[in-house]
Amino acid sequence: LSDLLVKNRRIKMKKRSLSVLMVLSLLLALALAACGGGAAEEPAAEAPAADAGAAAGEAAEEAAPAEAEGEKITIKLAENPWTGSMVNVAVAKILLEDRLGYPVEVVTIDENAQWASLATGDLSASLEVWPSGHAENVAQYIDGQGVVENIGLLGPIGKIGWYTPSYMIEKNPALVTWEGFADPAVAAEFATAETGDNGQFLAGDPSWVQYDADIIKNLGLPLQVVNAGSEQAILAALDSAYSREEPILFYFWTPHSIHAKYALTEVGLPEYSDACYATAAEGGVACDYPADELFKIAWSGLKDAAPDAYALLKAMNYTTEDQISMVAAVEIDGKTAEEAAQAWVDANEATWSAWLP
């Protein structure tokens, strides 16, 4: 019996030991699970990648204004109402858009109004200024305020004058100078219903630089100025008169393709002088127009706002013959200014490539 009691006591002790071991094992498992749970949270380390993405987004947003600032501005070119100006602008537009990637807007505006727009940056550049008519503008906007810049010569030499068909000189050689028109009977040959007894002097667009009314008054000529309204209107009147060999006296200029199409004679006026033109503001001009070295002007801020566009326009320079070839394509061949300019660009890469910055 005593042996049996001892045996039972040993069995119970073993059971208690097993229970303790099981409890210890369970506690150990829980501890390991807790440690393992901590390890399972390691994917949270991916958070910095998300933060980097957010930072990249913020950086992109911060960079956006910088990119916007780097966008090319629209270059606004002044187109004056004559064909030479139109083809100049068309050439510049092609190169600015195709070679430098600038958007270009062509603004039709008269040659006097353009100065105020250039001063404010509403216009970027004008590519054909005739200096004899713009002394006051140069003094105010370039020399005085410094808001417009002379960006160099275009190349062609221009000359405004009085013209009549050469057949009129053959009929009356005295008409080769202004003195031939001083005779009222001779001047009356150029009269129209609009001018009565006076001869008609056909001018162009009223916005053009022209001193003809002053010249006529100061020389005492029996002539009256009538504005045709445009270059095309002068050419139409010339074509009509020429086909009938009728008298016509008109304002025109070189370079222009009409001198290849028609036999014209420039009427001699008293020789140009600086002293004569010093009286222009008071209506005192009584002499010929000067030979003009055509030049280009730009908004003074263009150099900083669009340095490569500024460089191209500043370098732009070609010959009188270059310009006449494009004007002839428009006036004689019936092409648009854009078509004439593109043909010139296609044929003259050696010239314009030197303008590129």
Regions found by a protein language model. Name each.
Residues 70-84, 102-107, 198-202, 313:
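Short, well-ordered beta-strand elements
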Residues 117, 123-128, 200-273, 278:
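Ligand-binding pocket segment of bilobal, Venus flytrap-like solute-binding proteins
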Residues 80-83, 103-117, 226-237:
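Short helix-initiation/N-cap motifs at beta->coil->alpha
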Residues 146-201:
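A conserved helix-loop-strand patch within extracytoplasmic ligand-binding domains
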Residues 159-170, 292-305, 328-329:
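A bilobed periplasmic-binding-protein/Venus flytrap-type ligand-binding module shared by bacterial periplasmic
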Residues 30-34:
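C-terminal motif of bacterial Sec signal peptides marking the signal peptidase cleavage site
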Residues 89, 109-146, 236-237, 257-262:
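Pocket-flanking alpha-helical
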Residues 36-38:
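Bacterial signal peptide processing site
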